[in-house]
Every structure is written in C-alpha cells, then in structure tokens.
Amino acid sequence: MEHLTTESRNTQTMHLDEMSILEALKTINKEDQLVAKAIEPILPQLNRVIEQTITRFRDGGRLIYIGAGTSGRLGVLDAAECVPTFNTHPNEVIGLIAGGQQAMTEAIEGAEDNYEMGMTDLKAIHLNEKDVVIGISASGRTPYVKGALTYANEISALTVALSCNTNSDISTVASHALEVNVGPEVLAGSTRLKSGTAQKLVLNMISTMTMIGVGKVYDNLMVDLKATNHKLEQRSIHIIEEICGLTFEEAQELYIKADNDIKIAIVMNLCNTTKSDAQSRLINNNDIVKKAIQS
C-alpha cells in the first residue's frame, strides 16, 4: 500500500492540523483545482470507452458501475440520476456497491475484500456480452472490483477500470484503463477527497456523453427528462418553449397534447404534424430529434 499515490503523504499538508481554518481551506481548494487537469490526459481513452458504450447501449446493452465504499456510492449516485435526467429505465444504468444497499450509508466490514462477491453481484443482474462494466476503485486494487471485472471479461462484456493510481491492479484485468493521477490526498489515504471528485467527474462524462449519443439531448437541453415533480414539469415546458419559439402557455398546451413527451412535442411543432407521425419519425430515426425533424 505504501507505494500507492493515493496512500502517500501530501507535502503541502504535512502540518494540516496546525493550519488556521482559512489556511486549510485555501490549501484544500488549491489541491482540488488539480483534479480537472488530472483528467485531461485520459480524454482520448475516455473517448474510446464512450464510443463503445454508445454502440452497446443502442444494441440493448447496459452501463454498469461497480465499486466499494466511496467509489461504489459514486457509481450508484450517477446511475440513479440517469433516471430523472435522461428518462432511462432503472435497469439500463446500474450502480452496484460492495455490501449492497446498506453500504450506501454505513461501512460494511470486509465487503470490499470479497473477490467472489463482485462476480456474484454481476451474475445477480444477469450480466451479458452486450453490457459495459466500469469497475471503480481509487486505489485500483479492490478485490471486489477485480473479481467483477474478471467475471465480466469471461462473458465478453466491455470492461473498464477507473482508478486514481498508475499501473493499478484492476487496469490489468480490463479492456480499457482510465487512470486519473490526482496526487496524494490532503488527508493521507482519504480517497473521498480528490480521488472521489475525479471519479465523479469521469462518471458524469461517461453517462452524459453516452446519453447524448443515444439521442437524449437536443443542443444542450435534456429532451428526454422524466418529469417526476413540479420543477421538472416546468423545465420540460420551458425546453419546448425554447426550442419551438412558443409562449409558455403554447408550450404547455403542446406538452399536454404530446402526453408529456418533450421529444414528440418538439417534432409535432417543428414538422407541423400529428402526434402519431411524430412518434413514427422518432422510431425511424433512433429516437434522435434532429434526425426525426429532417426526415
């Protein structure tokens, strides 16, 4: 463990406990600013991962995050957000954490060290060769994640290792390695800090770009969001208003006519067509609004 960057002591915070609160905050903030830059070198690899994820997603595959502790929680968080943001089915983007749901709020002793459980959890969701499995581990050596990636390889799923150390163990068992070297943590070994931030940013990129690739975004607007509350319903109407150049009242009326489906509403308006025709256009164009409009 001592050779891992994530376990090393940060020379900028050797006397962290002696700093004033403001001095410590400035130091933490300065370290946090290194995170986005640390992601830049892996963008070409990330591009390849996302291209393949889009292809598999279109073919009925799923995006599956798996990790332990903070890493697992971040995967569960990103997966959960895809449902309201992009109207995905809960089974399309899945977050798995060592120790199960209970591990979201408390530490489960020994869970991350269980190699076989990583395999078992993937078997439980009936992993198949169309799926993409992203193993998340700041240290890059978590047995639970390594077991999951090993099993995923056996059934020909696409495997990706996301870690915050170079030449990590999990990188050796994945088709693609995403290694974000953020340097030693402000608090030695506390990977919920810079490492967690880096993982969150990378997962955001993967899910966002995948959803753009399968047609869930128009320009920079979420045209496939699921309006599960009043705020999101209002946002849906405003999106129609913005794209179609309508008043709020007109957009609201159109939204209702389209059975609360933003995409159908947009195609109906911009193509001056019926709901049925708008649906057909979308089906024939992989659910991509701009292509449906041009068809």
Curated annotation (Swiss-Prot):
GO molecular function ontology, one term from the record: ether hydrolase activity
Which UniProt keyword terms apply here? Answer: Carbohydrate metabolism, Lyase
Judging by the UniProt lineage, the source's domain of life is Bacteria
Report the top EC class in one word.
lyase
What reaction does this catalyse?
A: N-acetyl-D-muramate 6-phosphate + H2O = N-acetyl-D-glucosamine 6-phosphate + (R)-lactate
Protein EC = 4.2.1.126
Spell out the SUPFAM superfamilies in the cross-references: SIS domain
Family, per entry: Belongs to the GCKR-like family. MurNAc-6-P etherase subfamily.
Additional observations: A lyase-type mechanism (elimination/hydration) is suggested for the cleavage of the lactyl ether bond of MurNAc 6-phosphate, with the formation of an alpha,beta-unsaturated aldehyde intermediate with (E)-stereochemistry, followed by the syn addition of water to give product.
- UniProt function note: Specifically catalyzes the cleavage of the D-lactyl ether substituent of MurNAc 6-phosphate, producing GlcNAc 6-phosphate and D-lactate.
Q: How does it assemble?
A: Homodimer.
Q: What is this protein called?
A: N-acetylmuramic acid 6-phosphate etherase
Q: Which source organism does the UniProt entry give?
A: Staphylococcus haemolyticus (strain JCSC1435)
Q: What is the lineage of its organism?
A: Bacteria, Bacillati, Bacillota, Bacilli, Bacillales
